[in-house]
């Protein structure tokens, strides 16, 4: 089964209660839908959004089994195997050996950590917004390994490489995606 966004959101809330995790899921969902449209997958935008929404389904309850436990949960809920594979693949090289294959999986892999880093940069700005955020501001913070240390630069760079994009292109496109995502508002 491929759930609607509302059904996916309900499943997400069964396993996640922390506002930070819920906001992150909504941001990644919006970013995924944006990239679906930008990359010519308009007809799959809702599917990409569902994958983004559910990608960290197990993280709050089972952080040590991240991308492993969610496969069990999703299969038990009857979710389509494409969702199971896509969400698990964002843990490639970290917790699972499921490699991102489809463009959608590569986008998720590349942008998951990056949205966190961009969000952290935005929160440091007086505007607390991605609307006036520039590539150079993100790159400056990106170079500081202590800034948003939980956001793996290695994963971000590997994701850009998987997509055949430069790091600058990935960051710039993700900033644009976050500007188009209502959940990526930090100034409210």
Language model segments and positions:
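Acidic/His-rich, divalent-metal-binding segments that scaffold phosphate/diphosphate chemistry
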Residues: 1-62
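Electropositive phosphate-/nucleotide-binding environments in soluble metabolic enzymes
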Residues: 2-6, 22-26, 64, 101, ...
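Charged/polar positions on well-ordered alpha helices
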Residues: 27-34, 38, 72, 76, ...
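Divalent metal-dependent catalytic cores for phosphoryl transfer on phosphate-bearing substrates
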Residues: 41-147
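C-terminal binding/interaction regions
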Residues: 137, 143-172, 176, 185-188
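Internal active-site segments that recognize and position negatively charged phosphoryl groups
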Residues: 182
């Amino acid at each position: 089964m491929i759930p609607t966004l509302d059904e996916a959101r309900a499943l997400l809330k069964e396993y996640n209660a922390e506002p930070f995790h819920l906001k992150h899921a909504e941001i990644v969902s919006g970013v995924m839908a944006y990239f679906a449209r930008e990359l010519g997958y308009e007809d799959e935008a809702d599917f990409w959004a569902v994958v983004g929404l559910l990608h960290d389904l197990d993280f709050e309850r089972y952080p040590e089994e991240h991308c492993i436990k969610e496969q069990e949960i999703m299969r038990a809920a009857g979710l389509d195997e494409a969702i199971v594979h896509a969400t698990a693949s964002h843990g490639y090289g970290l917790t699972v050996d499921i490699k991102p294959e489809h463009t959608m999986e590569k986008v998720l892999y590349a942008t998951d950590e990056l949205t966190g880093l961009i969000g952290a940069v935005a929160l440091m700005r007086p505007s607390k917004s991605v609307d006036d955020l520039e590539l150079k501001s993100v790159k400056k913070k990106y170079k500081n390994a202590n800034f948003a240390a939980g956001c793996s630069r290695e994963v971000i760079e590997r994701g850009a490489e998987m997509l055949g994009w430069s790091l600058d292109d990935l960051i710039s496109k993700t900033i644009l995606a976050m500007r188009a995502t209502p959940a990526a508002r930090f100034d409210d």
